[in-house]
Amino acid sequence: MSAIFAAQAGAQVVVIEKNATAGQKLLLTGGGRCNITYTGTVDDFVRVYGKSGRFLRHCLHEFSPDATRDFFGQIRIATKVDEAGCVFPVSESAGNVQYALLDQCKKLGVQFVFGRGVEGIKKHGAEFVISAGKEDLTAHKVIIATGGASYPATGSTGDGYKLAKSLGHTIIGPKPALVPLITSEKWCAELAGISRDNVTISTIIDKKKVSVSGPMIFTYDGIGGPAVLDLSRLLTDYLPAKKPIEVAIDLVPAMNEAKLEEYLMGQLSQYSKKIIANVLFELVPKKLGGLICALAGITETNASQLKKEQRRKVIQLLKKLPLSIEATAPIEDATITRGGISTAEIDPKTMQSKVCPGLYFAGEIIDVDGPCGGYNLQIAWSTGALAGKIQQD
């Protein structure tokens, strides 16, 4: 994005890319469908980003979610909106988005140097000297858009942090964000692969209750899925911890406890000769129902034998299934990275370094991170467009 907008501004642009092609991480976004952005307003984005929102406000006004959709329409990527407000290409292909961006770069005369990583950047007077392989390149301005340290197989290995630090920048310690969570409970392995389209997960952080909602999946060592990834953003600064963080999962958020009890009473009456795990099959998958019965101590109990306190226990487990979170999965498994270049050292109106004039930043390398749903790609587009559009020969 920076290359396109810089070229449109009249700059001669060279992109140094250590991979064989650019945009490899883009191919993973949205499960390969590329969740381009979210339909919210600028104020919605600012609110979601919390403390970082003020820093991002200007770039979002300069290149808003609506402007993003218009831009992609101009490069022949038609978009659509799902029921959650997430914006995808009509083709549902991240590969198409990658191709369109590279094709636009080609049309604008952007030069690419593939297969060469940047080993160092030094500033001599008004010029930068970039060491990349066998020869050095010189430039009047440099935009570092190397991403974070998550998904290193895509080339995102934290190289940009070292380059920025060598030029005087402060790096906020990188941590995994939007990442699966590891639990103390080993029974999660028995449920690995079982998912729920919608759950609500609640916990206490700094004496305040916080909740996230969305799809979830059990994994071999814990839990994953969009709701869990959003929760991980809130927990990553507290993990790993000496004492696990307790969370409660509402497996049936569409029903309150009274409605759930009423429904369950009807099921127990209708299927009085069945064991409880089989009675729960319309609410949760059979394996999950079996686990709930095991936790309630009623594995072999028939519906007709269920006592009131046992029924209350089942309802409690369906509405507040307890889990103890020990740690996040490694940063290599994270969708994005928390941390990076301190926003205090970047001019929010230009994305230019306050430490090293002529140096700019865009995307995940900056210390901002958002939830699932197109928020992080929008920040990549907005910071990239802003860093690029002010460049001139």
Stretches found by the model and what they are:
Residues A20-A22, L27-L28, I36, V42-D43, ...:
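An anion/pyrophosphate-binding glycine-rich loop and adjacent beta-alpha core
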Residues R33-V81:
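Glycine-rich active-site loop/strand segments that organize a redox cofactor
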Residues V113, A132-K141, S211-G214:
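Core beta-strand elements of the Rossmann-like FAD/NAD(P) dinucleotide-binding domain
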Residues V113-F114, G120, G290-D369:
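A glycine-rich dinucleotide-binding beta-alpha-beta segment and adjacent secondary-structure elements
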